[in-house]
């Protein structure tokens, strides 16, 4: 680069231009431009070390062996066990599925909060009169306990303290000592299958209160307190 080109440049720009020109002269002297161009257009050949070996797997052909037969039956003709229906035979028809009986859903008149609290108060009073040797708790009935869902959750602390740590059959005794088996789900702390039968058989309704008394490791005595509707009449069955 001549001195004329350095006019109008700063000292830094002039030094940079001189460095670029010097590098160009060195590259021309070493013929680097032509070498890089030749490498760029040269065909690429794969390395033999990177080539994957193809594994040829021959399919094994196994000739089917004849069925094993005893010497006593070797000369007898082969028996074919094919199910052939006799001529004119008709297939058996399945009997139509019976319609599922509708589940009785207990209903009552309107129930006030005062009636619910009164039933719970009577249940707590009854519990206080029971033998303290047998643990117990009060359980007010809700809609999900006695209608369709029929899932009865039990107090967690009571379950963890007194009931089995695994699923078990828990028996419910009514006031006439009639037994009803239910499925106790330990991981959910509640009664599932069998509870619906007890609730429907005893006409439990939303708002009633119950007292569960554990008389045996997996047996409850159940006392029922009926709630009253707004007209003052107690629902009985």
From Swiss-Prot:
Subcellular localization(s) per the UniProt record: Nucleus
This protein's record includes keyword Nucleotide-binding: no
SUPFAM superfamilies: DNA-binding pseudobarrel domain
Superkingdom, natural source: Eukaryota
DNA-binding region listed in the record: 137-228
A Pfam family that the UniProt record links to this protein: B3
MF (Gene Ontology): DNA binding
Record-given protein name: B3 domain-containing protein Os03g0184500
Protein species of origin: Oryza sativa subsp. japonica
Lineage of the species this protein comes from: Eukaryota, Viridiplantae, Streptophyta, Embryophyta, Tracheophyta
């Amino acid at each position: 680069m001549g001195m004329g080109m350095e006019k109008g440049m700063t000292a830094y720009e002039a030094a940079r231009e001189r460095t670029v020109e010097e590098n160009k002269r060195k590259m021309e002297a070493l013929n680097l431009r032509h070498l890089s161009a030749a490498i760029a257009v040269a065909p690429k050949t794969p390395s033999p070390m990177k080539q994957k070996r193809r594994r040829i797997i021959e399919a094994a052909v196994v000739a089917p062996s004849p069925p094993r037969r005893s010497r006593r039956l070797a000369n007898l003709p082969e028996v074919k066990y094919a199910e052939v229906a006799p001529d004119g035979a008709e297939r058996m028809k399945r009997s139509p599925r019976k319609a599922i009986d509708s589940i009785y859903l207990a209903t009552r008149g309107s129930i006030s909060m005062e009636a619910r609290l009164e039933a719970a108060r009577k249940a707590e009073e009854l519990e206080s009169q029971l033998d303290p040797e047998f643990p117990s708790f009060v359980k007010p009935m809700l809609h999900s306990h006695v209608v369709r869902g029929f899932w009865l959750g039990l107090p967690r602390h009571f379950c963890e303290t007194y009931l089995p740590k695994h699923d078990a059959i828990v028996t419910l005794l009514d006031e006439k000592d009639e037994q009803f088996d239910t499925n106790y789900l330990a991981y959910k702390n509640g009664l599932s299958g069998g509870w619906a039968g007890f609730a429907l058989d005893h006409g439990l309704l939303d708002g009633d209160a119950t007292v569960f008394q554990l008389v045996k490791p997996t047996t409850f005595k159940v006392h029922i307190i009926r709630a009253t509707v707004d007209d003052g009449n107690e629902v009985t069955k």
